[in-house]
């Protein structure tokens, strides 16, 4: 699973998300889901950097990690995962956070 570090992933701004589900419907890998509050959440191991979710979000709540503003990256809860990560996935995730300058802890 360490190969996950090669993927860029997306930033999901929970403050902007309107719970429309367009991102969930657009993702060919089923890498997004709506959480218990109706907000978009990334399923890390399914994401393959297709970025369909970025293109269809009507309020621009989703962006590529490399293009997200520092303010968006610093918000608590901007990246959300559907399940706990394995130790290998956690290591890959930490490498990804370092690569893209991520500072906020997960919720």
UniProtKB/Swiss-Prot annotation:
SUPFAM superfamilies: 4Fe-4S ferredoxins (SSF54862). GO terms for molecular function: 3 iron, 4 sulfur cluster binding; 4 iron, 4 sulfur cluster binding; metal ion binding; oxidoreductase activity. Gene3D superfamilies: 3.30.70.20. It comes from the Archaea. [4Fe-4S] cluster binds at residues 17, 20, 23, 57. The keyword Zinc-finger does not apply. This is Ferredoxin. It comes from Pyrobaculum islandicum (strain DSM 4184 / JCM 9189 / GEO3). The lineage of its organism: Archaea, Thermoproteota, Thermoprotei, Thermoproteales, Thermoproteaceae.
């Amino acid at each position: 699973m360490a190969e996950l570090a090669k993927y860029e992933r997306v930033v999901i701004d929970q403050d902007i998300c309107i719970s429309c589900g367009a991102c969930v419907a657009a993702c060919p890998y089923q890498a997004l889901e709506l959480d218990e509050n109706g907000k978009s959440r990334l399923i890390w191991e399914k994401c393959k950097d297709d970025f369909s979710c970025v293109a269809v979000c009507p309020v621009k709540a989703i962006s590529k990690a490399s293009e997200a503003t520092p303010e968006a990256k610093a918000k608590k809860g901007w990246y959300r995962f559907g399940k706990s990560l394995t130790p290998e996935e956690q290591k890959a995730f930490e490498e990804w956070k370092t690569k893209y300058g991520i500072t906020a802890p997960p919720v």
